[in-house]
Amino acid sequence: MHWSDRIAQEIIRRRPDKEEYVCAAGISPSGSIHIGNFRDIATSYFVVKALRRQGKKARLLFSWDEFDRLRKIPVNVAKIARPEGEKPWDEYIGYPYVDVPNPYDDGCPNYAKHFENEFEEAMERFGIHMDYRYQAEMNRSGKYAQYVIHALKKRGEIFDILDSFRTQSAQEGERENYYPVSIYCPHCGRDTTKILSLSDDCTVAEYECACGHKGTFDFTKDFNCKLAWKIDWPMRWMYEGVNFEPGGKDHASPGGSYDTSRVIAKKIFDFEAPIFQGYEFIGIKGATGKMSGSSGLNLTPDTLLKLYQPEMILWLYAKSEPTKAFDFCFDDGILRQYFEFDKQYNDFMEGKGDEFLNTVMANCLLETGEEDGKPVYRKIETVPMSLLVQLGSVVDFNVPMLETVFGKIGQPFTYEQFKDRLDRAKYWLEQCSPENVNRLRPYRNWEVYETLNEEEKKEIALLHDYIKNGGYDLDELNQELYAIPKKVMGELQDPKELKKIQGQFFKNVYRLLIDKEKGPRLYLFLYAIEPEKYVSLLDFSTPMTEEEKQSLIKEEPAPEETEKKQVPLGEPDPVEPIREEIDIEEFSRMDMRVCKVLKCTEIRKSHSCYKLTLFDGLKERVIVSSIKSYYTPEEMIGKKIIVIANLKPARFSGVTSEGMLLAATNNACGCQVIFVDDIVPEGTRIC
């Protein structure tokens, strides 16, 4: 049974007679909505579909938490200049998102609406239709006013519930001065207010703001306020009648937001908390960086749609249990994902799928209508993505030439069949895997040719003559490529030796044509391209030309970099508010210690990460760090750094990292690793 069906059955078991079930999700529009947040929507979406399959009415409720405070300015927004005379971005920290100006010239009235529209348009491309709630309007219209007053009346009980989940004891007077609501200041617009007193009926408060403003707030008339998160969340469960809501593993942890809010829902709002499903975060393979909407990295659903078809993105979420992590692949792992999806899709369409596979596909395929009471799905043409990438690279993604090549190799796909994947193949190759772009050399590669022995040179001459004479089909070309080494070397008795010589021949051809030791399947590559474009690159019967001599000079490698890497810097990042305080016990659990860098090596296919081998005083350990843009390996080897040694191991760029180094990162200085004086022994604790 698929996990979405299992959750749907539990929802029905709890409330068998409910007319309509509500599955919820929600996000703050802090920036472009990233793919980690999308798991919130996907999880609820699949449960809604499962409920409907079981004959129940269900809807997907989505809350835009646009009335939350702006905590920090995303990097990409901070780079946008404010109009002359307008206050800078960092002065909007503490404002609700809906009151922050729109950074972009797109007609949206505010910051929140820009990012909301961006996300909602992407959801249409997934065929996901939601019942949206805009929390600024919900709060400011007074819809929650009675529940705010109710929470104020119960503030002592709420404090006791919150306090029961804390490890440290409450300070004297803390309970009496606790108010579960934030007031947005009418003078400065921020939530930097403090309630000083509350009327006996809990409807009127006296408050002051950090800006110096003081005032009276009537909760029956003034609605520019918001309940604290762990009270607001259960209040909205009750208000909307929510039956199911997922959340990240931070909310799902013991004593986390859900555990606390569940108790508040029951004891304060007399509502049974919805079924909750925690989910793991999403990984990115082949790219690095913190995946956060406010970081400015823009790893959004819209970005993913440039690489994956919408059904594939939903498929990756649907086939994985919510508690299991999975990766979106920017490296060649994406080709394996396309292959796996195509196989499962074809099995489903041919009626060969089991119950689990059929449910996965029913969850991820886009419905276009209904026939005989069953959904009709958008047809997917399973043109092999790996082949499209290979051949597209060969013919520079020219559509008529691609159709011709597909026909030549016995797979006559038309543009109508491969158009949905064509731009995605080109985008992946050029943006994510430029090292796999195959371009013919402009001149003969004399440097490589002169390293070949006489037999290898003869092989190249035979291939040149065969291509020049023409008159072959695809199969004949493939056979000739394997036969040429035999013609030169004679019949070899040892199959392994023959295979080795044939492999070296193929490698030599690739090096002469595209400066690489491997490439697309050679017979396809040579057959797909017009011979006139490359046959001269195999002809070394004439002397080196002046252009070729000049190209050798131009292609001499630059001296090995020894100076410190220079990275463009900019204005300082906005200073962030101090984070939530931790107690001494929590701090003492962090094991920070001095480690010596023994090795520093590049990670294949990672543009920003090094693999560092360290000695921590007890043993060697490996960490991964995205400092490649800022330091050369020589600058790191032999240095002593500070590492969080008891951080749970995690995989980055295919390498398991056993800790994290400490560094200061700011737009004004780039990344500055914190080095320790060599006099400090390895293994020394930092406290």
Kindly give the residue locations of the regions a language model identified.
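Conserved oxyanion/phosphate-binding beta-strand-loop segments in alpha/beta enzyme cores
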Residues: 1-19, 217-229, 594-602, 612
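N-terminal Rossmann-like or analogous alpha/beta NTP/dinucleotide-binding catalytic cores
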Residues: 1-159, 261-263
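Glycine- and acidic
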Residues: 24-33, 133, 239-250, 297-299, ...
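Active-site cores that bind ATP or allylic diphosphates and position pyrophosphate for catalysis
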Residues: 102, 128-301
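Catalytic adenosine-cofactor/nucleotide-binding cores of aminoacyl-tRNA synthetases and other
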Residues: 253, 258, 280-434, 514-553
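Small-residue-rich helix-loop
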Residues: 405-467, 474, 481, 485
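C-terminal accessory/binding modules appended to enzymatic or scaffolding proteins
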Residues: 448-511, 582-611
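Phosphate-backbone binding interfaces of nucleic-acid-interacting proteins
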Residues: 553-687
